[in-house]
Regions:
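N-terminal amphipathic alpha-helix/helix-capping segment at the start of soluble metabolic enzymes
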Residues: 1-24
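Short beta-strand/loop segments at the ligand-binding rim of alpha/beta enzyme cores
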Residues: 13-16, 85-94, 110-111
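Conserved, mostly hydrophobic/aromatic
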Residues: 20, 46, 50, 54, ...
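Active-site mouth loops of central-metabolism enzymes
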Residues: 22-41, 66-67, 92, 153-169
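Conserved anion-binding
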Residues: 24, 61-62, 107, 115-170
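Glycine-rich, proline-tolerant flexible connector loops at the mouths of alpha/beta enzymes
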Residues: 26-28, 52-79
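Generic structural signal for well-ordered alpha-helices
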Residues: 43-44, 77-81, 101, 122-125, ...
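Alpha-helix-loop-beta-strand connector modules within alpha/beta enzyme cores
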Residues: 66-93, 99-102, 129-141
Length: 170
């Protein structure tokens, strides 16, 4: 069974995060957990195997991945959140969209995992800031993975005008 948020905040040891990809084109599982029932079963299995946190991602970030619609991402995420919250899961939501993060937090998710470092949706850090109990995982980002030509961008496409910490701190 997953641990509670107080234990996560106070933890002095390593925690295990299980990854639940609910995408059609995941590089790691090829869409095995896209159906809500499959997502729930896999999330429960990871919890039973010792995962402290389940990280739900509904949009692939593999090289060359194409964006899914906001509505599709939100529907996938909320289906998984609504299935796993009653099971006692601590949920991390892997998203770059403020609207998806907000909806997931309102449905009980506790952590936002932003692979864009706040670069893709400038409102996302504000959504997290408005939820004081929410943890925010901020990652460095090289730009959207599928550019106009479908190629991976150069490392210098990330722009943090005032530095990473200052730009996401507010």
């Amino acid at each position: 069974m997953a641990i509670d948020m107080k234990a996560i905040h106070d933890s002095q040891s390593t925690l295990v995060m299980g990854v639940l990809n609910i995408t059609e084109d995941s590089f790691s599982d090829g869409g095995l957990w896209l159906a809500p029932e499959a997502a729930k079963a896999h999330g429960e299995a990871m919890m039973k195997a010792g995962a402290d946190i389940i990280d739900i991602g509904a949009e692939s970030t593999r090289p060359g991945a194409k964006r899914v619609s906001e509505a599709d991402e939100k529907a996938r995420v909320l289906g998984a959140v609504d299935a796993l919250i009653p099971e006692g899961a601590v949920l991390s939501i892997d998203t770059t969209r403020a609207s998806v993060a907000l909806a997931a937090l309102e449905h009980g998710a506790q952590i936002i995992n932003d692979v864009s470092g706040g670069q893709l949706d400038r409102e996302l850090p504000h959504v997290v800031a408005d939820h004081s109990d929410c943890l925010y995982i901020v990652q460095h980002w090289r730009g959207w993975l599928a550019g106009a030509a479908g190629n991976v961008p150069d490392a210098d496409t990330s722009r943090y005008e005032h530095g990473v910490v200052n730009d996401v701190h507010d």
